[in-house]
Regions:
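N-terminal secretory signal peptides and thylakoid transit peptides that target proteins
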Residues: 3-20
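Bacterial signal peptide processing site
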Residues: 30-32
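Post-signal peptide N-terminal segment of mature Sec-exported envelope proteins
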Residues: 38-57
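Mature extracytoplasmic domains of secretory-pathway proteins
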Residues: 56-122, 126
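C-terminal partner/receptor-binding element of secreted or periplasmic proteins
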Residues: 126-157
Length: 157
Protein backbone atom coordinates (compact mmCIF):
# COMPACT_ATOMS: atom_id res chain seq x y z
CA UNK A 1 0.00 0.00 0.00
CA UNK A 2 1.53 3.32 -1.04
CA UNK A 3 0.78 6.67 0.54
CA UNK A 4 0.54 9.46 -1.99
CA UNK A 5 2.27 12.56 -0.64
CA UNK A 6 1.63 16.19 -1.56
CA UNK A 7 4.40 18.59 -2.63
CA UNK A 8 4.19 22.31 -2.03
CA UNK A 9 6.81 23.93 -4.29
CA UNK A 10 5.73 24.49 -7.89
CA UNK A 11 9.38 24.34 -9.01
CA UNK A 12 9.81 20.93 -7.32
CA UNK A 13 6.57 19.75 -8.91
CA UNK A 14 7.62 20.84 -12.38
CA UNK A 15 10.95 19.04 -12.06
CA UNK A 16 9.23 15.90 -10.75
CA UNK A 17 6.71 15.93 -13.60
CA UNK A 18 9.44 16.31 -16.24
CA UNK A 19 11.76 13.64 -14.82
CA UNK A 20 8.89 11.25 -14.12
CA UNK A 21 7.54 11.75 -17.63
CA UNK A 22 10.95 10.93 -19.10
CA UNK A 23 11.15 7.82 -16.92
CA UNK A 24 7.67 6.75 -18.02
CA UNK A 25 8.54 7.16 -21.70
CA UNK A 26 11.85 5.29 -21.36
CA UNK A 27 10.24 2.57 -19.27
CA UNK A 28 7.37 2.20 -21.72
CA UNK A 29 9.88 1.74 -24.52
CA UNK A 30 11.67 -0.96 -22.57
CA UNK A 31 14.82 1.15 -22.03
CA UNK A 32 14.71 0.94 -18.24
CA UNK A 33 14.99 -2.39 -16.41
CA UNK A 34 11.96 -3.65 -14.53
CA UNK A 35 9.44 -1.64 -16.55
CA UNK A 36 6.47 -3.04 -18.45
CA UNK A 37 5.06 -1.46 -21.59
CA UNK A 38 1.48 -2.06 -20.44
CA UNK A 39 0.49 0.21 -17.56
CA UNK A 40 -2.55 -0.88 -15.59
CA UNK A 41 -4.04 2.37 -14.30
CA UNK A 42 -4.13 5.94 -15.56
CA UNK A 43 -6.03 8.98 -14.33
CA UNK A 44 -6.12 12.57 -15.55
CA UNK A 45 -7.94 15.45 -13.89
CA UNK A 46 -8.12 17.72 -16.91
CA UNK A 47 -6.70 20.64 -14.94
CA UNK A 48 -3.81 18.82 -13.32
CA UNK A 49 -2.80 17.21 -16.62
CA UNK A 50 -1.17 14.27 -14.88
CA UNK A 51 -1.29 10.51 -15.18
CA UNK A 52 -0.80 8.03 -12.37
CA UNK A 53 0.84 4.83 -13.56
CA UNK A 54 0.59 1.62 -11.55
CA UNK A 55 2.91 -1.30 -12.23
CA UNK A 56 2.32 -5.03 -12.11
CA UNK A 57 2.91 -5.01 -8.34
CA UNK A 58 0.14 -2.38 -7.95
CA UNK A 59 2.56 0.28 -6.68
CA UNK A 60 2.56 3.79 -8.21
CA UNK A 61 5.32 4.35 -10.75
CA UNK A 62 5.31 7.76 -12.41
CA UNK A 63 3.52 11.03 -13.01
CA UNK A 64 3.77 12.23 -16.59
CA UNK A 65 2.88 15.75 -17.70
CA UNK A 66 0.48 16.30 -20.56
CA UNK A 67 1.72 18.48 -23.40
CA UNK A 68 -0.53 20.98 -25.16
CA UNK A 69 -3.56 19.63 -23.26
CA UNK A 70 -3.31 16.24 -24.95
CA UNK A 71 -2.05 12.87 -23.79
CA UNK A 72 -0.32 10.28 -25.90
CA UNK A 73 -2.31 7.17 -24.99
CA UNK A 74 -0.02 4.88 -27.01
CA UNK A 75 1.73 4.04 -23.73
CA UNK A 76 -1.44 2.79 -22.09
CA UNK A 77 -3.90 -0.04 -22.38
CA UNK A 78 -7.60 0.49 -23.16
CA UNK A 79 -9.57 2.27 -20.43
CA UNK A 80 -13.14 3.34 -19.88
CA UNK A 81 -14.20 6.89 -19.05
CA UNK A 82 -17.40 7.44 -17.09
CA UNK A 83 -18.71 8.54 -13.72
CA UNK A 84 -17.17 7.56 -10.37
CA UNK A 85 -18.08 4.21 -8.79
CA UNK A 86 -19.46 2.68 -11.97
CA UNK A 87 -17.94 -0.39 -13.54
CA UNK A 88 -16.09 -0.57 -16.82
CA UNK A 89 -17.93 -0.70 -20.14
CA UNK A 90 -21.27 0.53 -18.76
CA UNK A 91 -23.45 2.80 -20.89
CA UNK A 92 -22.09 5.91 -19.15
CA UNK A 93 -18.54 4.99 -20.16
CA UNK A 94 -16.58 5.86 -23.27
CA UNK A 95 -13.85 3.56 -24.52
CA UNK A 96 -10.39 5.11 -24.76
CA UNK A 97 -8.58 3.38 -27.59
CA UNK A 98 -4.83 2.91 -27.57
CA UNK A 99 -3.09 5.01 -30.19
CA UNK A 100 -5.77 7.72 -30.07
CA UNK A 101 -5.26 11.18 -28.60
CA UNK A 102 -7.73 12.81 -26.24
CA UNK A 103 -7.94 16.25 -24.68
CA UNK A 104 -7.26 16.02 -20.95
CA UNK A 105 -10.62 17.74 -20.44
CA UNK A 106 -12.25 14.64 -21.92
CA UNK A 107 -10.39 12.23 -19.66
CA UNK A 108 -12.00 13.05 -16.32
CA UNK A 109 -12.63 9.58 -14.95
CA UNK A 110 -10.47 6.61 -15.86
CA UNK A 111 -11.08 3.06 -14.70
CA UNK A 112 -8.82 0.18 -13.87
CA UNK A 113 -9.45 -2.42 -16.57
CA UNK A 114 -10.83 -4.95 -14.08
CA UNK A 115 -11.82 -2.94 -11.03
CA UNK A 116 -13.11 0.16 -9.30
CA UNK A 117 -12.93 3.63 -10.84
CA UNK A 118 -9.88 5.79 -10.22
CA UNK A 119 -11.01 9.42 -10.31
CA UNK A 120 -8.92 12.47 -11.07
CA UNK A 121 -10.60 15.48 -9.42
CA UNK A 122 -10.18 18.94 -10.99
CA UNK A 123 -7.43 20.16 -8.68
CA UNK A 124 -4.44 22.45 -9.08
CA UNK A 125 -0.85 21.69 -10.02
CA UNK A 126 0.16 21.42 -6.34
CA UNK A 127 -1.43 17.96 -6.21
CA UNK A 128 1.32 16.40 -8.31
CA UNK A 129 3.67 14.30 -6.20
CA UNK A 130 6.82 12.30 -6.82
CA UNK A 131 5.94 8.94 -8.33
CA UNK A 132 2.20 9.34 -7.83
CA UNK A 133 -0.62 11.87 -7.43
CA UNK A 134 -2.87 12.93 -4.57
CA UNK A 135 -6.49 13.75 -5.34
CA UNK A 136 -8.34 14.24 -2.05
CA UNK A 137 -5.59 15.06 0.40
CA UNK A 138 -2.01 14.40 1.48
CA UNK A 139 -2.97 11.09 3.12
CA UNK A 140 -4.67 9.67 0.03
CA UNK A 141 -3.67 6.06 -0.50
CA UNK A 142 -3.63 3.89 -3.56
CA UNK A 143 -5.20 0.59 -2.50
CA UNK A 144 -5.16 -2.74 -4.34
CA UNK A 145 -7.88 -5.26 -3.57
CA UNK A 146 -8.05 -8.55 -5.53
CA UNK A 147 -11.86 -8.35 -5.60
CA UNK A 148 -12.32 -4.61 -6.18
CA UNK A 149 -9.21 -3.73 -8.18
CA UNK A 150 -7.21 -0.56 -7.70
CA UNK A 151 -8.81 2.45 -6.04
CA UNK A 152 -7.89 5.66 -4.25
CA UNK A 153 -8.83 6.01 -0.60
CA UNK A 154 -8.67 9.09 1.63
CA UNK A 155 -8.79 8.30 5.37
CA UNK A 156 -9.72 11.96 6.05
CA UNK A 157 -12.76 11.95 3.77
Amino acid sequence: MAVLQRRSSRRDLAAVAVFSGVGLVLGGCGLLPGRRREIEVAASSGLTDAVIAVGEDHEPRDVASATEEEFDWDRFAVYTIGTPATTINEESGVIVETGERYSTQEVLFVFHRDGTAVRGAPSGFEFLAHGAGAWWGPRTQLVWDPEQGTRLEDPDA
